[in-house]
Amino acid sequence: MEERPTTYKKFSYDCEGETIINSVRISCYENEEHGEVDLDRAFAKSCNTAFVTLGSKLDIKQFATLNKKCLFNQNIPFDLSVKKSRFELNEHSDKGEIPQTVIGQGNTLMTPFHNALLMCAVANDGVLMKPYVIDHIEGADNTTVKENIPEIYADLMSKKDAKKLQKMLREVVTDGTGYSLDTDLYTAAGKTGTAENEGKYAHAWFVGYSNVEDPDLVVCVLVENTGAGSKYAVPIAKKIFNSYYNNNMKEYYGEKKNTAQSDE
């Protein structure tokens, strides 16, 4: 979207389940044929062949710069020790590495922490806040002795691009691989992922957020050696979201009941 802000909207592709780019065969999960897709539909359905076709036309140097902007190969300040996510593709890379890399495979490695931060930025209109574990510390007399004040860490994308991604992420839930998260209890948006694992069962991914009107919770799930993200990671995310909102509803209605009793 940054490299081709006008033409990406016209993208169209006929998915037949697999394709060959730079002598590398790329398949959609279980060779599913998605048929005619635009960018939004390809995203919602996790169409690998559409994205590898689109990604193979990107300027590799600009692509690497974008990933640097998104904090790959960097230490992210945090209270706990976390590894760096790894992105190796550059203008000197073998052409065979491009197809795998543009769909998040190959030598690309990403931590759940990093994935969650990127989703936080998207949900926050492109702005990433500095992450921390402890909100504040209170003394024995209940006074605050230390407090972490929210501060901006980085602007990762424009508000316009973030809004577009929010719409696409929402469609993953309403009409895509994250459909099992579509519920009346809350609204959700996110992205599933299925990372290949050298002939073993794939790693299942899901990262997303809830309450799309005013996002309040980001969840990232990685289940190793299992299979599709929609089958193994999404159900876990749903349990987390459900627990969060069910508990909040209990607290809310409990407070209303107590208030009503005190008024009487």
Pin down the residues of each PLM region.
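Beta-lactam-recognizing serine transpeptidase/beta-lactamase-like catalytic domain environment
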Residues: 1-223, 260-264
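Intrinsically disordered, low-complexity acidic/polar segments
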Residues: 216, 228-230, 247
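Short, gly/Ser/Thr-rich active-site loops of penicillin-recognizing serine hydrolases
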Residues: 144-150, 236-264
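Extracytoplasmic/secreted cell-surface and envelope-processing proteins
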Residues: 51-53, 228-232
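Short amphipathic alpha-helical face segments that pack within enzyme cores
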Residues: 111-117, 232-239
